[in-house]
Every structure is written in C-alpha cells, then in structure tokens.
Amino acid sequence: MFIKIKARPHSGKQEVVKVNDREYLVYLKSAPENNKANLELLKILKRYFKEEVRIKSGFTSREKIMELY
C-alpha cells in the first residue's frame, strides 16, 4: 500500500495526523539535515502502522510517497 506524507520537520513534537485514508501529516522533532528527519519519519510510521515502511519517492522533499509492506 502507498500513502502520501507531508512531513513537518523541526516542529518540536512527534505526531501523526490522518488527513484521509491515503494522506498523513507527520510532525517531526528532527531537523531536515543529514537524513535525520527521514530516519525519524520511518521510525514513527513503523510504530504507527505496525508494518515495515520505506520511502518510495521524495527523499529530499517534505512531501513523500511511502510504501507499507
């Protein structure tokens, strides 16, 4: 399954907000440098969905397509 993520790095909190069935807004504490925000995003989504997660597109963007498997 693929989902669309809008990441908000350096927000001071960790939170996943469901916008609709395939779109989520994710607040991250980490800054978007040295891959820190992406690693935090993967960790949060894995815990939220209880599935393996990977970034399909948008590695350097705040809007990403994620694959759950």
Could you tell me what each predicted segment is?
Residues 1-34, 39-43, 47, 51-69:
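Contiguous, often N-terminal, cationic amphipathic patches that form binding interfaces
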